């Protein structure tokens, strides 16, 4: 009898432990990226990303619709608009990675939406939907005042770490880079390559997905202000980067604007400027992809040789890769 009681007690203990440990085991067993990751938003890559097609409920007064995540001129665009005949008055977009990411440096280049009652965001998240504890790290822009960025994080559903940073510019007027370095004992937040804040309490531990969304609030007027129903509103994103080893020392965060390389002789054509507008930017990248996919058979620029970025006498995917590396500042010039 004594042995049987002990056996029953041990079985009960193992069952309890399995309930406690299981969610954390699943987090560790998920696909966690541990190599550098760069996504330039020229098109929808369904192998790495997904468009949300559901509603979060709670304070989110919208339903996520894939139609509200679009791509144009080298940008991913989230659009908040009216929703007719549905359970929610508004529809908007959420874009999220399929893989999970852990400690490291995360960066986005984006332009926030401006309007009272809304939020534009860049964040990592995992939670009960992934069979994980709720861990999250946020960079959010409250549309009522886009001269500030709000930093926050959650560990096992516990937040309360909000910090409002004065940017010194309006995040809705132009593209800027925002990032954070997540480590076991701190989170450093960056704006345009400069570290602006460090958090050290209650740091999250569970790898999460990279996410971006745009949404109107409900029941949070004290925080966001009362949404006035204005539509459409858009937040725009150019790229996302992740470096597991932290901020790259030999590849600093991009500056707010992309400066095209200038030939020594101003009469020479500009390498990579395939649309002939005198600049090398995401528009050229989009045109280059259309050319390689045979959607177009010529570039708008007169001198087609500008597309031979690596000067090997061919126009192919190697040139496109080099152009991409230039746009994300992995190389200084073309």
Swiss-Prot record:
Gene of this entry: licB
Residues spanning the signal sequence: 1-27
Similarity section: Belongs to the glycosyl hydrolase 16 family.
Domain Dockerin: 267-334
Domain GH16 span(s) in chain numbering: 28-248
PROSITE patterns linked to this entry: CLOS_CELLULOSOME_RPT, DOCKERIN, EF_HAND_1, GH16_1, GH16_2
Gene Ontology MF: a single term: licheninase activity
Superkingdom of the organism of origin: Bacteria
Gene Ontology biological-process annotations: polysaccharide catabolic process
Reaction catalyzed: Hydrolysis of (1->4)-beta-D-glucosidic linkages in beta-D-glucans containing (1->3)- and (1->4)-bonds
Catalytic center residues: 136, 140
EC assignment: 3.2.1.73
Annotated spans, Disordered: 246-265
Coiled-coil stretches: none
InterPro entries in the record: Beta-glucanase/XTH, Beta_glucanase, ConA-like_dom_sf, Dockerin_1_rpt, Dockerin_dom, Dockerin_dom_sf, EF_Hand_1_Ca_BS, GH16
Alphabetical list of Pfam families matching this protein: Dockerin_1 (PF00404), Glyco_hydro_16 (PF00722)
Protein name: Beta-glucanase
Keyword line: Glycosidase, Hydrolase, Signal
């Amino acid at each position: 009898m004594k042995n049987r009681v002990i056996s029953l007690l041990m079985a009960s203990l193992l069952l309890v432990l399995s309930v406690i440990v299981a969610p954390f085991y699943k987090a560790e067993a998920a696909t966690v990226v541990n190599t550098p990751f760069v996504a330039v938003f020229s098109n929808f890559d369904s192998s790495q990303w997904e468009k949300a097609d559901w509603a979060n409920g709670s304070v989110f007064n919208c339903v996520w619709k894939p139609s509200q995540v679009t791509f144009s001129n080298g940008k991913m665009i989230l659009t908040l608009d009216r929703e007719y005949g549905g359970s929610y008055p508004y529809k908007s977009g959420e874009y999220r990675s399929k893989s999970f990411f852990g400690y490291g440096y995360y960066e986005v280049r984006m332009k926030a939406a401006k309007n009272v009652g809304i939020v534009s965001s860049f964040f990592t998240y995992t939670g009960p939907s992934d069979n994980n504890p709720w861990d999250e790290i946020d960079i959010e822009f409250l549309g009522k005042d886009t001269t500030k960025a709000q930093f926050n994080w959650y560990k096992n559903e516990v937040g309360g770490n909000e910090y409002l940073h004065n940017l010194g510019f309006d995040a809705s007027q132009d593209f800027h880079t925002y990032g954070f370095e997540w480590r076991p004992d701190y989170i450093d937040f960056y704006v345009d390559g400069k570290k602006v804040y460090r958090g050290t309490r209650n740091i999250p531990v569970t790898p999460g997905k990279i996410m971006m969304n745009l949404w109107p609030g409900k029941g949070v007027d004290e925080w966001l202000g009362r949404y006035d129903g204005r539509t459409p509103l858009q937040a725009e994103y150019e790229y996302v980067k992740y470096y597991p080893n932290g901020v790259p020392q030999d590849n600093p965060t991009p500056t707010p604007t992309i400066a095209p390389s200038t030939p020594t002789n101003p009469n020479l054509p500009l390498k990579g400027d395939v649309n002939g507008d005198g600049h090398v930017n995401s528009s050229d990248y989009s045109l280059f992809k259309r050319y390689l996919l045979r959607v177009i058979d010529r570039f708008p620029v007169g001198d087609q040789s500008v597309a031979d970025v690596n000067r090997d006498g061919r126009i192919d995917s190697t040139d496109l890769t080099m152009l991409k590396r230039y746009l994300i500042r992995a190389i200084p010039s073309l």
